[in-house]
Amino acid sequence: IDAIGLQCHLAPGNLDMEAFLQLVEQIRQRGLPIYITELDVNDQIFADDIAERDQQVAGVYSDFLQEMLQQPGIEIIQTWQLSDKYSFYQGRQERQVRVLPFDREMQAKPAYHAVAQALAIQGND
């Protein structure tokens, strides 16, 4: 085993961050690099208003990444696609999903800026 990938399809309200961080620590103690993979945020419980929902999704990305980037051993962060157009959640909800950093036309959304800011902050530490 060269590394451990943790699929992170985040569902707000369903993530026990303390337990997740304990898992990350257990993996780190074994000397394995940790890859955050398939990162997206299920927006199903968020507001119908797109601007409000985008901010809510961005907040989840920001909170999660700020916590994760403080952990030693995190080497890769990878989203589950870049654009909502290709999201796993497309067709699983009645409304258009807004779960990834870019919209259907590849325009950056608040989630993109939240990810970029979290990475920039970590890069300055």
Residue spans for each PLM region:
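Short, conserved beta-strand edge motifs with alternating hydrophobic and charged residues
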Residues: 2-7, 35-38
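Residue-level recognition of the N-termini of beta-strands and the immediately preceding loop/turn
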Residues: 1-2, 75
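Aromatic-rich peripheral "rim/lid" segments of glycoside hydrolase catalytic domains that contact
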Residues: 15-125
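Surface-exposed cleft-lining segments at the edges of enzyme active sites
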Residues: 6-14
